[in-house]
């Protein structure tokens, strides 16, 4: 007889899954500690879209709160954008089943986006702006001192390369930021967690995933190209993605070219800069470092640049 796949409940009790759960919670805990994301008395509004990332974020924060050295409140928040076919009963039922305080906000941003954006064009930018305004307003209404978003390590790296390749900037997603009006602190506790681990965890937990019909099938072509590139590197060159992620926390402004970050104009022979002379030294690389190969996302041939 063919083997029967274990149920979600059975897999949640396997040693493999428990190790994965511990790994994710440890990553979230380290990010919170490293960036002082949550303190005693904070109210954390966790934005839950119904996707794997936000479900995982909520699960990890609830688990960590049980043993955290500080006391903080968690409020799950979902924005119902009135997308056709959106199952508005799924998230309330889930929140109640796990006993978390929650707020469902209903705003028909779907109609606004469809009215303003021509058919076939990417809706992400306008949708994001509308959603951000509603999230900030809701955070103020419930007294949230922190707004937690479900972006993970791979999102941050994709954004870094998007800005470098298409925007001419070295800019990614910060793990913690203050809104432009200074009223809200936004945190990304999954900053150290990988998408692969999150996907495995979400499958094991059997979260009631809700697809986004507005944008889920029209993934930005540029982001898709970057994602494909990073996935290829992860597959072909083990350790490269981890090194890239580490580089986001090891920036040396004096070895870049931005005068807003380092005073090159005022630099003289009397100026002492850490790592100054190392510019002449070869970088310390593993003995068998693999060459970096870039291919066009639509290129199935051998054309490459190393």
From Swiss-Prot:
- Keyword field: 4Fe-4S, ATP-binding, Cytoplasm, Iron, Iron-sulfur, Magnesium, Metal-binding, Nucleotide-binding, RNA-binding, Transferase, tRNA processing, tRNA-binding
Q: Give the superkingdom in one word.
A: Bacteria
Looking at the UniProt record for this protein, which Gene Ontology cellular component terms does it annotate, in alphabetical order? cytoplasm
Please state where this protein is localized: Cytoplasm
Q: EC class of this enzyme?
A: transferase
**GO terms, biological process:** tRNA thio-modification
- Report the sequence similarity comment from the record: Belongs to the TtcA family.
- Give the protein name, as stated in the record: tRNA-cytidine(32) 2-sulfurtransferase
């Amino acid at each position: 007889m063919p083997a029967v796949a274990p149920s979600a409940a059975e897999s949640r009790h396997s040693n493999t899954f428990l190790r994965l759960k511990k790994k994710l919670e440890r990553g979230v805990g380290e990010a919170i500690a490293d960036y002082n994301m949550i303190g005693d008395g904070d109210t954390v509004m966790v934005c839950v879209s119904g996707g794997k990332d936000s479900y995982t974020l909520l699960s990890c924060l609830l688990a960590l709160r049980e043993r955290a050295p500080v006391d903080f409140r968690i409020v799950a928040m979902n924005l119902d954008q009135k997308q056709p076919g959106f199952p508005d009963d799924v998230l309330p039922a889930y929140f109640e089943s796990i006993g978390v305080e929650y707020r469902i906000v209903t705003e028909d941003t779907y109609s606004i986006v469809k009215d303003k954006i021509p058919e076939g064009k990417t809706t992400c930018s306008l949708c994001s702006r509308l959603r951000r305004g509603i999230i900030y307003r809701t955070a103020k209404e419930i007294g949230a001192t922190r707004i937690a978003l479900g972006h993970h390590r791979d999102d941050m790296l994709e954004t870094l390369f998007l800005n470098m390749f298409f925007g001419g900037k070295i800019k990614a997603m910060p793990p913690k930021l203050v809104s432009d009006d200074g009223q809200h602190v936004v945190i990304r506790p999954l900053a150290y967690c990988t998408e692969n681990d999150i996907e495995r965890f979400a499958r094991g937990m059997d979260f009631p995933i809700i697809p986004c019909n507005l944008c889920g099938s029209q993934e930005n072509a540029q982001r898709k190209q970057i994602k494909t590139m990073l996935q290829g590197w992860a597959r072909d060159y083990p350790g490269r993605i981890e090194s890239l992620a580490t580089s986001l926390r090891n920036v040396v402004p004096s070895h870049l070219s931005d005068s807003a970050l380092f005073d090159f104009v005022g630099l003289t022979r009397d100026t002492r800069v850490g790592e100054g002379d190392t510019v002449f030294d070869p970088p310390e690389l593993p003995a068998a470092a693999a060459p970096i190969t870039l291919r066009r996302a639509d290129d199935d041939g051998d054309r490459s640049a190393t």
